């Protein structure tokens, strides 16, 4: 079209500005495009703009001239600067496909100039079309250039005269009319949109082909079946005929032998009867087979008719579509010179004919260039005919600019970015400076008529375009392109992951392109791309090293990509988190990404260098150094990093701002290298964790103990930590900042995904499984993050529900999953707890004074948040808010009123505390909780320290913790809930990570919800427990023996816990009057299987308890006192608690380990556990028998514990009143016990269920330092201690 003046301007600008003109010529470029095939390609690129703007076809039409002109101009361009070449190209409109071969030669040369010209023409086109002018002016005053372009036209043309022909001058700079541009935009919109439909068609036809392939043998089989039927019937008839021939005369009496009276006809009658029956059978078979065959025949005939109709319809549609496409093509060609444009349509310039050669080249270049529009290239490649594809190639190439802005400097930048990828090939001839500008030309060149010389021409043009882009988009391209070139193989993947960066979209686009144009196009240019990449890669490596040394300060484009980078970061972090869950990566990834970004800035060097070491061997040394740092921190970071990741998520705002395209890429690559991110998170953890050292030390242990599980839990913990880790100083702020959205989310999702938002981010897969069974848990999650406060406030009402639901599911899931997945799940379960434990611990330490009092209840609440890991962390931060909003209800009521606290505690405590992730967190958290309650009750700090050291046993800690809070609330129901919780706590990681567990939990949870909620929801559980103790004890006791049996059996069969919980729910349903207590008791029965499970775990727990023997021994007394009330209900639900006591005995053996160990075994193996289970059930049912259970706990811990439980039963009954107080106190004791359980946390790893039994023992001790020292105190002392604790 009249783009030649633009070329002249481009030439002038090129001559004057050198590379700068590359930017300016963009505005002028329309002329160049019109004049040169490159111009036409830019037109195609423009056409991409034009395709978007409707220019593609119009531009395409002139492109024939441009192709010819460009061919000649390109030939001259070799000799002359781009300006002359451009003008010549434009002036040479008629004829140079041959010169296009020259262009190939001079393309490296021209590529440099042409990029400028092409970009200039693009600029003018863009200005004319989409405001390329404005962007060009931003690049180089495109409009000014256009104005000056006319003046320059003469000067540029003079250049052209020197180099090419003055032909450009006559052409004059012509802007594409708005209608033309819009028409082309619409046309390309149509073409691109149709590509996806063609994809769908291909997919459908593929499916149809497969179906037919399956159907054909089926139909053949049908025919074979009928053939077989006919054959068998024929055999029957043939045999009958043979028979008739043989016996025809002998079937009846001989006529003359005897008189008819004397001839018995019995045989004949029998034969007649049989034959008549056979005839009936034959008639049935004949009708059946005949009707079926007729039906099949009619069906297939009808199908054939329908297929014929479909065929005729499709042919009509094909004709219509072909007509439309032909008209579109003819109209496009009609817009320009008919003769010339007919040729361009089949020429590279138009992109139609170029599809095969130039488009292939472009696709190759595009892959190299990482075209901006990865999808677009595919679309255009699919939809556009060869010429259209060439155009679209350019268009697609430019469309990415168009996406950024059709005529904007971004166009140049975008085109530059794609060029950058094309660059590699073009870059061979054009230098790396041309790389970015080459890309557009490369794209442009395919449309050029360089059909035969397309590879070289495209390449050359790509090169020429590249210089311009280099300047215009070089800032972005230089870094992103160099990056992409540098790590083009891996970085392309990274770019794909981080499409936000030019390199990302560039490289994505090339992949699309290759799809449109198969490897053919790729191979020719990719070799060059490799060479160019080597150059760029070196530069980029240097840049990367510098930026990395500066902690990746070269963040190219943080603009809207930051969010994406955060997401990518999440991916980066997420992979390590969800070792068990990869599906949940992305949600956590975002937060993790921001964490990664912040970590990248702080400790990103480690991950970045690690990734660079992968992607860039030049950076291997630095990466190794950082990797070593990462390796060091990985042990800590795996736990800490999870917290730091949360912290990273917490500092997400700051971190996310920093993410750059490079950072995104690095993170994308880091996503592959998860260990790197832990290093990053490590630094964040340091920021977030007030007690990183303590927790890190634990984390160090735990990472070793549970490296893989920790990763998965790290993912969870990360999310929990996102809210929980900052809880100390900025947790509240973060919760407030993130909590609004998350609170809203959690409030909205809390029922379904209360903690799921965090979990989704951190552990989407585990949580989703949990979702199945976590409807109740979600309300608890609401309590945990931001919604934790809000949802606790509004969720207090449904806390019981949520707790009731989760507790049983947790118990069941914990039992079944912990038993089955104890070995596997322990790691899974433990790792998240360590993370959260670390987080919780520091948070607990921070919160301990504040939440120490509320901790007793808060643990319940915080346990309530238990969407798993969030529980502990959320408890810490949620403790203030949840305690403020919910604690009054749960904590105060639980302390003052067993009923109120019990429902809440049971709800939150059972449900949330069951979060196994929280067990570790509760370990640390429980120490905080313990410290909190000890602060309330004194001497909890040592427990917290112990818990910190024992945080390895998060599960146990959490289980005990759960038992503690539930007992405070509704001991009867809580006991049942507590055990499920404890089981769940032990298996919450499993539950969280294994939806099956939670799925199982859900039924139980539902049952509990039905039955327990009645007690919990009414908040009458303790009253009911007190009131219904007599009758509930009966039914509970009746139920409890089965439960006890279950307890015994679950140890043998890990799955038993689930079935027993189910049956226990049934039992719970059975004792509907004692629903509050009996229901709780049946759940306890359900948990009882958990204790049986503990036998196997007991060994593990015994080992672990040995680690925490001192702590447990100290806590044992407290556990007795605290757990007596809580245990009665919680522990009824938690025969494993008695097992825990056995575990505790192992841990207590230091003081009274031997005796305790024996009681533990007795608990598991002997009727003692059953008795305890019965007592517990009774206590749970009566809610007054916690003490008996406590005694049992004590007895478990102590050899004489069994006899004591009966003695304690009266005390338990007498403690009914204390149960409310004890429930709150016990919750703290349970927390304390959890610290003790923390010691058993390693044991938990060994045996999750065991962890819960020790929990009972530990809880009492943890709550009361005195009981710790006197854990072997008489049952009466534990009782007194619970009372004292209750008082406190």
Swiss-Prot record:
Localization annotation: Cell projection, Cilium, Photoreceptor outer segment; Photoreceptor inner segment
Protein purpose: Plays an essential role for normal photoreceptor cell maintenance and vision.
Annotated Gene Ontology cellular component terms: cilium; cone photoreceptor outer segment; photoreceptor inner segment; photoreceptor outer segment
PANTHER family in the record: PHOTORECEPTOR CILIUM ACTIN REGULATOR
Protein name: Photoreceptor cilium actin regulator
Biased composition (Acidic residues): 483-495
Tissue-wise expression: Specifically expressed in retina.
Illness association: Retinitis pigmentosa 54: A retinal dystrophy belonging to the group of pigmentary retinopathies. Retinitis pigmentosa is characterized by retinal pigment deposits visible on fundus examination and primary loss of rod photoreceptor cells followed by secondary loss of cone photoreceptors. Patients typically have night vision blindness and loss of midperipheral visual field. As their condition progresses, they lose their far peripheral visual field and eventually central vision as well.
Domain of life: Eukaryota
Gene name per UniProt: PCARE
């Amino acid at each position: 079209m009249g783009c030649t003046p633009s070329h002249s301007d481009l030439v002038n600008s090129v001559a004057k500005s050198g590379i700068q003109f590359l930017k300016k010529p963009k505005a002028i470029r329309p002329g160049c495009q019109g004049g040169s095939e490159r111009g036409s390609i830019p037109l195609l690129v423009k056409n991409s703009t034009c395709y978007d703007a409707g220019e593609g076809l119009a531009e395409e039409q002139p492109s024939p001239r441009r192709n010819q002109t460009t061919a000649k101009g390109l030939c001259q361009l070799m000799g002359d600067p781009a300006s002359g070449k451009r003008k010549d190209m434009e002036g040479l409109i008629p004829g140079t496909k041959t010169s296009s071969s020259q262009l190939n030669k001079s393309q490296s040369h021209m590529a440099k100039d042409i990029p400028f010209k092409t970009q200039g023409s693009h600029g003018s086109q863009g200005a004319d079309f989409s405001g390329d002018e404005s962007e060009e002016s931003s690049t180089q005053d495109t409009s000014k250039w256009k104005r000056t372009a006319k003046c320059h036209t003469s000067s540029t043309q003079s250049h052209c005269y020197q180099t090419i022909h003055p032909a450009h001058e006559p052409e004059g700079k012509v802007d594409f009319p708005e209608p033309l541009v819009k028409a082309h935009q619409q046309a390309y919109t149509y073409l691109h949109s149709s590509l996806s439909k063609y994809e769908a068609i291909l997919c459908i036809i593929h499916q149809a082909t497969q179906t037919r392939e399956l159907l054909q043998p089926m139909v053949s089989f049908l025919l074979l079946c009928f053939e077989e039927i006919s054959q068998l019937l024929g055999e029957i008839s043939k045999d009958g005929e043979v028979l008739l021939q043989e016996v025809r005369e002998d079937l009846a009496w001989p006529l003359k032998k005897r008189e008819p009276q004397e001839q018995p006809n019995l045989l004949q009658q029998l034969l007649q009867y049989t034959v008549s029956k056979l005839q009936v059978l034959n008639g049935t078979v004949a009708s059946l087979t005949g009707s079926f065959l007729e039906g099949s025949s009619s069906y297939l005939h009808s199908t054939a008719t329908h297929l014929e109709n479909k065929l005729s319809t499709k042919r009509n549609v094909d004709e219509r579509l072909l007509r439309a496409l032909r008209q579109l093509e003819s109209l496009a060609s009609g817009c320009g010179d008919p003769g010339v444009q007919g040729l361009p349509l089949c020429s590279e310039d138009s992109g139609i004919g170029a599809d095969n050669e130039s488009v292939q080249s472009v696709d190759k270049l595009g892959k190299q260039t990482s075209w901006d529009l990865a999808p677009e290239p595919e679309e255009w490649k699919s939809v556009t005919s060869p010429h259209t594809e060439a155009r679209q190639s350019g268009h697609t190439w430019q469309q990415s600019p168009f996406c950024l802005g059709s005529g904007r400097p971004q166009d140049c930048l975008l085109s530059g970015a794609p060029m950058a990828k094309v660059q590699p090939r073009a870059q061979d001839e054009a230098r790396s400076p041309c790389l970015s500008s080459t890309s557009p030309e490369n794209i442009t060149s395919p449309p050029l008529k360089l059909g035969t010389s397309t590879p070289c021409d495209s390449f050359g043009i790509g090169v020429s375009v590249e210089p311009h882009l280099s300047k215009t988009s070089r800032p972005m391209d230089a870094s992103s392109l160099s990056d992409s070139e540098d790590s083009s193989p891996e970085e392309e993947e990274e770019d794909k992951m981080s499409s936000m960066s030019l390199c990302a979209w560039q490289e994505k686009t090339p992949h699309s392109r290759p799809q449109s144009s198969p490897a053919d196009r790729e191979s020719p240019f990719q070799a060059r791309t490799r060479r160019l990449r080597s150059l760029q890669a070196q530069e980029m490596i240097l840049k990367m090293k510098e930026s990395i040394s500066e902690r990746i300060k070269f963040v190219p484009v943080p603009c809207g990509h930051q969010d994406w980078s955060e997401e990518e970061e999440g991916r980066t972090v997420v992979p390590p988190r969800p070792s068990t869950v990869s599906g949940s990566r992305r949600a956590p990834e975002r937060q993790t990404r921001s964490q990664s970004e912040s970590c990248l800035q702080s400790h990103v060097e480690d991950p970045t260098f690690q990734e660079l070491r992968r992607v860039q061997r030049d950076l291997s040394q630095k990466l190794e150094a950082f990797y070593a740092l990462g390796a060091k921190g990985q042990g800590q970071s795996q736990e800490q990093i999870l917290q730091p990741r949360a912290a990273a998520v917490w500092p997400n705002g700051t971190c996310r701002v920093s993410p750059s395209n490079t950072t995104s890429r690095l993170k994308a690559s880091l996503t592959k290298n998860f260990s790197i991110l832990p290093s990053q998170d490590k630094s964040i953890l340091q920021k977030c964790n007030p007690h990183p050292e303590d927790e890190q030390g634990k984390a160090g242990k735990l990472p070793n103990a549970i490296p893989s599980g920790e990763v998965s839990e790290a993912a969870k913990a990360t999310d929990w930590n996102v809210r929980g880790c900052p809880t100390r100083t900025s947790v509240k702020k973060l919760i407030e900042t993130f909590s609004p959205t998350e609170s809203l989310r959690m409030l909205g999702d809390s029922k379904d995904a209360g903690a799921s938002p965090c979990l989704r981010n951190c552990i989407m897969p585990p949580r989703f499984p949990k979702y199945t069974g976590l409807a109740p848990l979600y309300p608890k999650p609401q309590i945990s993050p931001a919604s934790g406060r809000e949802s606790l406030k509004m969720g207090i009402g449904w806390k019981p529900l949520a707790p009731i639901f989760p507790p049983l599911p947790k118990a069941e899931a914990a039992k079944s999953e912990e038993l089955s997945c104890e070995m596997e799940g322990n790691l899974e379960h433990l790792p998240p707890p360590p993370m959260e434990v670390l987080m919780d611990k520091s948070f607990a330490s921070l919160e301990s004074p504040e939440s120490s009092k509320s901790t007793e209840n808060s643990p319940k609440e915080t346990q309530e948040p238990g969407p798993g890991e969030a529980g502990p962390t959320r408890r810490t931060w949620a403790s203030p808010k949840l305690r403020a909003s919910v604690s009054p209800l749960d904590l105060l009521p639980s302390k003052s009123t067993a009923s109120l606290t019990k429902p809440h505690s049971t709800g939150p405590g059972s449900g949330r505390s069951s979060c196994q992730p929280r067990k570790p967190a509760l370990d640390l958290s429980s120490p905080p909780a313990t410290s909190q309650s000890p602060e309330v009750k004194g001497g909890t700090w040592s427990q917290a320290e112990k818990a910190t050291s024992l945080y390895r046993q998060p599960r146990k800690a959490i289980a005990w913790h759960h038992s503690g809070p539930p007992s405070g609330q509704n001991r009867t129901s809580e006991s049942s809930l507590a055990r499920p919780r404890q089981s769940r706590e032990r298996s919450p990681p499993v539950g969280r990570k294994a939806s099956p567990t939670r799925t199982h939990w859900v039924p139980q949870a539902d049952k509990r919800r039905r039955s327990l909620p009645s007690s919990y929801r009414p908040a009458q559980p303790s009253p009911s427990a007190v009131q219904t103790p007599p009758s509930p004890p009966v039914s509970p006791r009746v139920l409890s023996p089965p439960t006890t049996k279950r307890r015994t059996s679950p140890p043998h069969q890990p799955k038993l816990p689930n079935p027993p919980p189910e049956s226990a729910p049934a039992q719970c349903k059975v004792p509907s009057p004692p629903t509050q207590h009996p229901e709780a008791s049946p759940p306890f029965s359900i948990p009882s299987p958990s204790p049986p499970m503990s036998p196997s775990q007991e060994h593990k727990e015994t080992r672990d308890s040995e680690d925490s023997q001192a702590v447990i021994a100290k806590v044992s007394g407290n556990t007795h006192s605290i757990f007596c009330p809580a245990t009665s209900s919680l522990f009824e639900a938690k025969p494993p608690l008695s097992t825990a006591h056995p575990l505790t005995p192992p841990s207590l053996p230091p003081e009274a380990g031997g005796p305790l160990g024996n009681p533990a075994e007795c608990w598991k193996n002997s009727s003692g556990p059953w008795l305890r289970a019965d007592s517990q059930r009774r206590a749970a049912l009566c809610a007054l028998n916690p003490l008996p259970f406590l005694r049992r706990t004590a007895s478990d811990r102590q050899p004489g514990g069994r006899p004591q439980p009966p003695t304690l039963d009266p005390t338990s009954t007498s403690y009914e009143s204390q149960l409310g107080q004890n429930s709150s106190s016990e919750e703290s004791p349970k927390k304390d016990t959890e610290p003790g359980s923390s010691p058993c946390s390693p044991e938990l790893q060994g045996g999750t269920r065991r962890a819960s039994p020790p929990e009972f023992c530990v809880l009492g001790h943890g709550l009361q330092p005195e009981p710790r020292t006197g854990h072997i105190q008489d049952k009466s002392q534990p009782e007194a201690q619970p009372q004292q604790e209750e008082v406190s």
